[in-house]
Amino acid sequence: MNGKRIQATGATLRVKQVRSVVGQKQNMRDTLRSLGLKRPGQVVERKADAATVGMINTVTHLVEVEEA
């Protein structure tokens, strides 16, 4: 799902940070922190509700997403 916009389905998504926030705008840093990601390589699982999907779509260039 990397690079593609995802939809809110209620499924569980596994989100992995693959790029650093160094050089990114502050809103990108804040979005990753809101998702619970602190460093590249870290993985979190989140429910695919509207708020989470919106955050993921904001930082698609920094994360990889797969269905859990």
From Swiss-Prot:
GO terms for biological process: translation. GO terms for cellular component: cytosolic large ribosomal subunit. GO terms for molecular function: structural constituent of ribosome. Keywords: Ribonucleoprotein, Ribosomal protein. It comes from the Bacteria. It holds the Pfam family Ribosomal_L30. The keyword Transferase does not apply. Coiled coil: none annotated. The keyword Cytoplasm does not apply. HAMAP family: Ribosomal_uL30_B (MF_01371_B). Belongs to the universal ribosomal protein uL30 family. Part of the 50S ribosomal subunit. This is Large ribosomal subunit protein uL30. It comes from Kocuria rhizophila (strain ATCC 9341 / DSM 348 / NBRC 103217 / DC2201). The lineage of its organism: Bacteria, Bacillati, Actinomycetota, Actinomycetes, Micrococcales.
